[in-house]
Every structure is written in structure tokens, then in C-alpha cells.
Amino acid sequence: MNSTLSSQVENHSIYYNFSEKNSQFLAFENDDCHLPLAMIFTLALAYGAVIILGVSGNLALIIIILKQKEMRNVTNILIVNLSFSDLLVAIMCLPFTFVYTLMDHWVFGEVMCKLNPFVQCVSITVSIFSLVLIAVERHQLIINPRGWRPSNRHAYVGIAVIWVLAVASSLPFLIYQVLTDEPFQNVTLDAFKDKYVCFDKFLSDSHRLSYTTLLLVLQYFGPLCFIFICYFKIYIRLKRRNNMMDKMRDNKYRSSETKRINVMLLSIVVAFAVCWLPLTIFNTVFDWNHQIIATCNHNLLFLLCHLTAMISTCINPIFYGFLNKNFQRDLQFFFNFCDFRSRDDDYEVIAMSTMHTDVSKTSLKQASPVALKKIHSDDNEKI
């Protein structure tokens, strides 16, 4: 595309489409700015892999948890909610964003123009606040084990509140997202006839900046700070408890289990924060001064940041499910199209909020009074 066409479009002052915290830049570039075919092919493979892993991983996780009655505890209910929101992101966010960024015009119609960013914003809000509720449950189980503990009913209520909050905070995308051909109206080239762009058209730049800044705090910095505080307190408590047990007896298994829990807790939070940090920085910089980012580098930089953020949809099934032996065993049945067998006697009950393994019902029936006393004592120390 020549520089004259670029100037014509720039006169309309419509350079970008900020969609659910995911900026979309209308990069009307010259020929030197086009991404190489090899790069496009590589990005397409990467996006395809993330979509497949995100959809299959979260779908498997949801089916496995819902299929097993033994697994319907507070944390697993929240994990299903988290996986469902990640599933929506993988379906509604990845393919549409990738195609739109490469094509620089919207081809999916007016309904999807409004629905796509709305669903994306809802899904991301649900994901981060599901992590918040999981952190709250873990905090109560570890820091205050004899105090208030969330029940399944509390989990369902919390999920309902999360979705209401997510929908309410995402409504501006339904209201202000528009499908228009305004950037192409004065363009005479046939290639741009009947082409449309999808972008948010707020009342003013100040309104848009206020809203996007609110989302930045609501969807990233605020929840992450809260989660880090909860897990830091958990880490301190587990460390003290581990030191006390080392003084009382040599318990290498418990020490190893505590260490694994600490690594798991830290990995969950760090993975989410690291995945979303590049896109968060990109959107923040672009919102306040989009001219900082060179036009030719915009699409590629955005896609790399966006792809990194979307990897988080694949990480959650790994951390919450596939590192669990029960999930690994059930996953084999899932992909072999076999029925899940009932394991009332030998199913290994996992308190996902702590990754603590309880003994099976069979072993409880065969345990001696001394062993039962020890088991109950260990249950009081559940983390």
C-alpha cells in the first residue's frame, strides 16, 4: 500500500480498535510493513496449537470433574468455572483476534463485532476472580482451619456474583462497539470497497481512558495483589508448620508435600501474571500514547503479546488437573472414549485447594484404632 493511501486513512484519525483490553491497530501499511508469509504461517501454527490445547484441555478438565461425584468440592467447582471461562476465551478470543489483526478489516458481521469483545472481557474477568476465590478458600483452609470454611453453596454464590460483576463491567463493549466503513470512505481503491472495521467509539478519549484504566485495575493489578498477599501468608504458615513438624519427627514425605504445594501455589499466580504482563503493558502504552509504537511493528508486536496472554488458557489445566494422578488416569479414559468407572472404594480424594491426598475408604475400613487416630490428627493439619 502506498503512502498516499496511508495519509488518506490517517486523516480520519481512526487508528485502532481497543477490544476488551486487546488493542487492535488498523495498520494501513506500505508494502514493507506486511508480515512475511513465514511469520504468518508460524503465528497461525502457534495460535492453532493454543486453541486446540486450550479447548481440549479445559473441556477434558470440566468433563472429568463433573463426571466424578467424589471431586465435587469447593475448589473443583471453582476450577470448572475457571476452565469454562478459559474455554470461552479460546473459542471467542483467539481465532477472531488473529484473523482481524492480519486482515485489518472485520469480516464477521455486526453481531460478532459487539459480542466478541464483550465475551472476551467477561471471560477474562471471570478467570481472574475465580483465581481470587480459590486463593480465599486456600487462605481459610490453611491460615484459619478452625474458622469459617466456604461450602459448595458458597462457591455457587461466589460464581454467580463473579458473572454478574463480569457482565456489568463489560457492558460498555455492547454499547460503544460499532461496525463502520468510516476509515475507508475516502479511499478510492477497489480493494477497500465494502470493507468494515470494528472498534469502540466512546463519547470521548477521556471516557475511554477512564474505562480501560478501570479494567486494568479490575482485571489485573487489583486481583493479583490480593492473590499474592493470600499466597504469601499461606507460604509463611506452611513454612512454620513444616519447621515445627521437623522438630517433632522426621517426616520427609510431609516436608516434600509442603514444598510441592508451595511451588504449585507460586507457579499458578506467576504463570497468570507473566502471561498477561506483556499484553497489559502493550495496551497501557498504546492507550495513552499509541504513536510510541511504530506502525510497521504494531501488528506483530500485538500478536506476540496477545498469544503470550492466551497461553494462560493452556496452563490452568496443567497446574490444576494434569499434575494430579487422578486426572491423569481419568484423562486416559477421556481420550480413549471409555466410560468413567466408579471408584467409591479406591478413588484417591484430592483436596485441590491444597493438593493434599486423603486415604481411600478401603484403607480407612482396614485401619487400626491407632492408625485412625493418626489419620484424624493429620486431617486437622490439612493444608
Swiss-Prot record:
<keyword id="KW-0325">Glycoprotein</keyword>
<keyword id="KW-0472">Membrane</keyword>
<keyword id="KW-0675">Receptor</keyword>
<feature type="transmembrane region" description="Helical; Name=1">
    <location>
        <begin position="45"/>
        <end position="65"/>
    </location>
</feature>
<feature type="topological domain" description="Extracellular">
    <location>
        <begin position="282"/>
        <end position="299"/>
    </location>
</feature>
<keyword id="KW-0449">Lipoprotein</keyword>
<comment type="function">
    <text>Receptor for neuropeptide Y and peptide YY.</text>
</comment>
<feature type="topological domain" description="Cytoplasmic">
    <location>
        <begin position="233"/>
        <end position="260"/>
    </location>
</feature>
<dbReference type="GO" id="GO:0043005">
    <property type="term" value="C:neuron projection"/>
</dbReference>
<keyword id="KW-1003">Cell membrane</keyword>
<dbReference type="GO" id="GO:0004983">
    <property type="term" value="F:neuropeptide Y receptor activity"/>
</dbReference>
<keyword id="KW-1133">Transmembrane helix</keyword>
<feature type="transmembrane region" description="Helical; Name=3">
    <location>
        <begin position="117"/>
        <end position="137"/>
    </location>
</feature>
<feature type="transmembrane region" description="Helical; Name=2">
    <location>
        <begin position="77"/>
        <end position="97"/>
    </location>
</feature>
<dbReference type="InterPro" id="IPR000351">
    <property type="entry name" value="NPY1_rcpt"/>
</dbReference>
<keyword id="KW-0807">Transducer</keyword>
<keyword id="KW-1015">Disulfide bond</keyword>
<feature type="disulfide bond">
    <location>
        <begin position="113"/>
        <end position="198"/>
    </location>
</feature>
<feature type="transmembrane region" description="Helical; Name=7">
    <location>
        <begin position="300"/>
        <end position="320"/>
    </location>
</feature>
<feature type="topological domain" description="Extracellular">
    <location>
        <begin position="176"/>
        <end position="211"/>
    </location>
</feature>
<feature type="lipid moiety-binding region" description="S-palmitoyl cysteine">
    <location>
        <position position="338"/>
    </location>
</feature>
<protein>
    <recommendedName>
        <fullName>Neuropeptide Y receptor type 1</fullName>
    </recommendedName>
</protein>
<feature type="topological domain" description="Extracellular">
    <location>
        <begin position="1"/>
        <end position="44"/>
    </location>
</feature>
<dbReference type="GO" id="GO:0008188">
    <property type="term" value="F:neuropeptide receptor activity"/>
</dbReference>
<feature type="glycosylation site" description="N-linked (GlcNAc...) asparagine">
    <location>
        <position position="11"/>
    </location>
</feature>
<dbReference type="GO" id="GO:0042923">
    <property type="term" value="F:neuropeptide binding"/>
</dbReference>
<dbReference type="InterPro" id="IPR017452">
    <property type="entry name" value="GPCR_Rhodpsn_7TM"/>
</dbReference>
<feature type="glycosylation site" description="N-linked (GlcNAc...) asparagine">
    <location>
        <position position="17"/>
    </location>
</feature>
<feature type="glycosylation site" description="N-linked (GlcNAc...) asparagine">
    <location>
        <position position="2"/>
    </location>
</feature>
<dbReference type="GO" id="GO:0005886">
    <property type="term" value="C:plasma membrane"/>
</dbReference>
<keyword id="KW-0564">Palmitate</keyword>
<feature type="transmembrane region" description="Helical; Name=5">
    <location>
        <begin position="212"/>
        <end position="232"/>
    </location>
</feature>
<feature type="topological domain" description="Cytoplasmic">
    <location>
        <begin position="138"/>
        <end position="154"/>
    </location>
</feature>
<feature type="transmembrane region" description="Helical; Name=6">
    <location>
        <begin position="261"/>
        <end position="281"/>
    </location>
</feature>
<dbReference type="InterPro" id="IPR000611">
    <property type="entry name" value="NPY_rcpt"/>
</dbReference>
<keyword id="KW-0812">Transmembrane</keyword>
<comment type="similarity">
    <text>Belongs to the G-protein coupled receptor 1 family.</text>
</comment>
<dbReference type="Pfam" id="PF00001">
    <property type="entry name" value="7tm_1"/>
</dbReference>
<feature type="modified residue" description="Phosphoserine">
    <location>
        <position position="368"/>
    </location>
</feature>
<keyword id="KW-0297">G-protein coupled receptor</keyword>
<feature type="topological domain" description="Cytoplasmic">
    <location>
        <begin position="66"/>
        <end position="76"/>
    </location>
</feature>
<keyword id="KW-0597">Phosphoprotein</keyword>
